[in-house]
């Protein structure tokens, strides 16, 4: 079945990355024969040298689950992998309760993990799929600059299969992915960018410019009583340039704005 599933997935979704969650070291050679893209290791195997070593020697990306694990356990697992491998490691954090109550998610701990280990962080969601929090809470973790968002999917949650508490039905999963993509788009990039055409238009009618408040003849020496800061259809001289015109002689007749 696994051979058929992987083959179908690759043919149907050419850009799909296939990661396999490993629980037994004896299955790794078979998994490798499927030509997968990477491995996920359960937090129960953070101290399992047989699984850690065999997966590490494949030199493929590793998603390392760290839920309900100590900092020392995580450090030891990372060191063991790095000592024998060039695998890229992503730490996958998630509260290990099914379903997870929002107050137990402890989302900010992902920042601590990222700061301490200097590695990419992913979030494993186990929130109640029968509740709105099963949608918005995992989506909210995108604001924590995670690299991977793990969400369970099931054919039918009502049948109560493995991890059904947090698993979305297919149509729900489609909606969830749409939500995630929307948030990703909204996040943008952490860099200065050119104004959009909407922002340019906003600047034109919202930003204030220096204008004259009455009809003034040329030769007049401008003072504060002659000018004001107002919105105009097009940007003129910005208010912070007022010192450039106060006390200067007007060279042309100027009508009040």
For every predicted segment, state its role:
Residues 1-257:
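Catalytic cores and adjacent flexible loops of soluble metabolic enzymes
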């Amino acid at each position: 079945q696994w051979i058929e599933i992987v083959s179908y997935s690759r043919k149907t979704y050419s850009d799909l990355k296939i990661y396999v969650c490993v629980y037994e070291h004896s299955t790794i050679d078979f998994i490798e024969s499927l030509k997968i893209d990477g491995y996920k290791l359960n937090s129960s195997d953070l101290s399992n040298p047989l699984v850690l070593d065999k997966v590490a020697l494949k030199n493929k990306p590793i998603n390392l689950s760290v839920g309900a694990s100590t900092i020392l356990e995580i450090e030891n697992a990372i060191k063991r992998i790095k000592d024998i491998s060039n695998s890229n490691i992503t730490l996958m954090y998630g509260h290990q309760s099914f379903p997870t109550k929002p107050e137990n998610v402890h989302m900010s701990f992902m920042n601590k993990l990222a700061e301490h280990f200097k590695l990419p962080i992913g979030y494993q969601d186990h929130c109640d799929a029968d509740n709105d929090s099963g949608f918005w809470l995992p989506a909210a973790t995108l604001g924590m600059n995670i690299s991977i968002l793990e969400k369970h999917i099931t054919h039918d949650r009502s049948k109560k299969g493995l991890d059904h508490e947090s698993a979305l039905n297919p149509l729900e999963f489609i909606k969830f992915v749409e939500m995630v993509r929307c948030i990703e788009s909204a996040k943008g990039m952490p860099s200065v960018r050119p104004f959009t055409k909407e922002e340019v238009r906003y600047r034109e009618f919202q930003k204030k410019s220096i204008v004259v408040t009455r009809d003034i003849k040329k030769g007049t020496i401008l003072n504060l009583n002659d000018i004001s800061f107002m919105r105009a259809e097009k940007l003129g001289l910005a208010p912070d340039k007022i010192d450039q015109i106060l006390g200067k002689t007007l060279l042309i007749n100027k009508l009040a704005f």
